[in-house]
């Protein structure tokens, strides 16, 4: 979140300035950083959730599904990249690494998946009812995730970092994704927070400076 915070831009202006200033010789990511007041709250709450980016991430989102029988068939038909049952869990225990962004499971698999929670958890892959990833509606959930759903969580400083695309996106597409993320985070305001919740919103590219967005904090 580096950069000169004394100058603020509208979201549209900030994104356009960001794209014009990106000079790296690779396709830089574009990220939004949202500074929240949760780090200062006595409860030490963290904010976590998921949001579908209207314009996607600009790359394939990969999904693994733990299911069997008809549910496994539904997941495969919906486009899941990896589908497995107890055998897959055993392979993960033995060191197989899942090259995916999300894991989904049917409810009956959760007791077995708990055995690999220490493997999936640190990578943010543990199925979670809060994200809709413990479900029998596998085809629907695979479709939602594939359309560009991303997870987010505030860090210990109360900052939420979310990738909203890359410098190959149009300003309009980045703006749509930006607005979706900000709205999702604002919608999770804890009732325990008094006064200001969003203290500042910034956009930046991987190697570029950050731009403070006016009217969002």
From Swiss-Prot:
Q: How does it assemble?
A: Part of the 50S ribosomal subunit.
CDD domains, A to Z: Ribosomal_L1
Q: What Gene Ontology molecular function terms does this protein carry? A: rRNA binding; structural constituent of ribosome; tRNA binding
Query: GO biological process: what's one of them?
Result: regulation of translation
Name of the protein described by the UniProt record:
Large ribosomal subunit protein uL1
Is Nucleus a UniProt keyword of this protein? no
SUPFAM superfamilies this protein is in? Answer: Ribosomal protein L1 (SSF56808)
Gene (name only): rplA
Q: Which Pfam families match?
A: Ribosomal_L1 (PF00687)
Function (record text)? Binds directly to 23S rRNA. The L1 stalk is quite mobile in the ribosome, and is involved in E site tRNA release.
**A cellular-component GO term for this protein:** large ribosomal subunit
Taxonomically, which superkingdom? Answer: Bacteria
**Matches recorded under InterPro entries:** Ribosom_uL1_bac-type (IPR005878), Ribosomal_uL1 (IPR002143), Ribosomal_uL1-like (IPR023674), Ribosomal_uL1/biogenesis (IPR028364), Ribosomal_uL1_3-a/b-sand (IPR016095), Ribosomal_uL1_CS (IPR023673)
Q: Which family does it belong to?
A: Belongs to the universal ribosomal protein uL1 family.
Could you tell me the keywords of this UniProt record?
Repressor, Ribonucleoprotein, Ribosomal protein, RNA-binding, rRNA-binding, Translation regulation, tRNA-binding
């Amino acid at each position: 979140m580096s950069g000169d915070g004394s100058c603020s831009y509208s979201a549209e202006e900030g994104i356009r300035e960001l794209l014009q200033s990106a000079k790296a010789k690779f396709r830089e990511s574009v990220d939004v950083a949202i500074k929240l007041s949760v780090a200062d709250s006595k409860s030490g709450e963290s904010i976590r959730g998921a949001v579908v980016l209207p314009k996607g991430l600009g790359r394939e989102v990969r999904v693994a599904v733990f299911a069997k029988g008809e549910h496994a068939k539904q997941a495969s038909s919906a486009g899941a990249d990896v589908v497995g049952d107890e055998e897959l869990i055993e392979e993960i225990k033995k060191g197989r690494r899942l090259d995916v962004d999300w894991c989904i499971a049917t409810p009956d698999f959760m007791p077995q998946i708990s055995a690999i929670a220490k493997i999936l958890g640190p990578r943010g892959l543990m199925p979670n009812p809060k994200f809709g990833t413990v479900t029998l509606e596998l085809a629907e959930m695979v479709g939602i995730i594939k359309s560009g759903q991303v997870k987010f969580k505030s860090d210990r400083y109360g900052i939420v970092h979310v990738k909203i695309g890359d410098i190959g996106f149009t300003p309009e597409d980045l703006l749509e994704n930006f607005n979706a993320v900000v709205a999702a985070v604002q919608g999770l305001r804890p009732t325990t927070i008094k006064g200001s919740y969003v203290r500042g919103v910034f956009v930046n590219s991987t190697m570029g400076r950050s731009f403070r967005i006016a009217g969002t904090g």
